[in-house]
Amino acid sequence: MGTHLAKLLSKERQDCVLIDENEDRLEELADYDILTLQGSPTSIKTLKEAGAEAADLLVGVTPDESRNLNACILAHALGTRKTVARIDNYEYLAPQLEPFFKNLGIDSLIYPEVLAATDINNGLRMSWVRQRWDVHGGALVMLGVKLRETCEILNKPLRELCGADDPYHIVAIKRGAETIIPGGNDELHNLDFAYFMTTKEYIPYIRTICGKEHYADVKNVIIMGGGKTAVRAALTTPDYMNVKIVEADERRCEKLNELLNETDTMVIHGDGRNIDLLLEEGIKNTQAFVALTGNAETNILACMTAKRLGVRKTIAMVENLDYVGMAEELDIGTIINKKTIAASHIYQLLLDADVSNLRSLMTVDSDVAEFTAAEGSAVTRKPVKDLGLPSGMTIGGLVRNGKGMLVNGGSLILPGDSVMVFCHENNLKKVERFFKQRSLW
């Protein structure tokens, strides 16, 4: 995770130092514009050498929770402005403990498995949607939908579909390997992956025009792999869903039964790739299959098998980013990557503007973020069409006084509005200047 984040920050031209005790791991980054330092992240000497006394952010994402927390505490004491630690103790996420950790010098805690489980359950709640992103508890919603021949709005110019009074905007289209930030002359085609921005009450309408009404709502779920992500997902699925976890390790099955004893989750000892086992466990009457083993290839193949057996909704955890493209080409469905989910959470701490809910969308090499417009910021001075936004940046909607609304060229953004920004191949540091107080043109 640290390596992925360091590469991301290097790409964004952030000065970055990566600390690791493993010299071989550091040598793998020789081709990147990243300064590496061999040493312990809990060594004051090493932290000083890395520049912790003047750093904007220290990120502790080793597999060792205690080491991450200690590194953050030490870096804060040395003068680092913000710190974030990766944890695996769910207790630490309790809201009442936030001031406690803040007093220790730890600004933010991330539990990647919890973040991934949230994405998984968002996908399970809407079987026809591959990605969902909510602003202000769903006042504004972005939906990523794979379009098929049943879609009513194919092969029509968007200017005929997405007028000022229409209940949705299309902020991006993925067509093959190409990402399109659409204009009025662009059209949607069969097999496109489209991102719709809408408000909560119009989600059923989007489902209808996309031709997805025949998708059965998810009631029965099979999860393959009984790791931490599976546990967090099973603990947070809606009560109306029946969840089965298939785990190959017998001792882990015993542990899962202990962890999930207060839920209705059924734990099954077996290989989730075994077709006879899947048939025995009712895969023909299962609406969603979630593959969460630690092996990307296994997860992809398992989802392909589930699809052949009639499961419409499949979700695969793909930690190896090299396999994400292949998973998309194979039409796996929803792809979960803990590295990008956690990196998005961390990256927003580097932005000076008031930004939250930042997400990286692997499928379209883009970011989507919720910015709050500051008093006197550039984005509040003119209608959207006159702002001179960078190419690849789209404002999809905003939330004002708790009410979601779409944005068009004539819209005027007010101070305090929460604004959804879709940003393709753009440095978010360039985007945030529009939302900061006393922004300069």
Q: What are the roles of these predicted feature ranges?
A:
Residues 1-441:
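Cytosolic regulatory regions of ion transport systems
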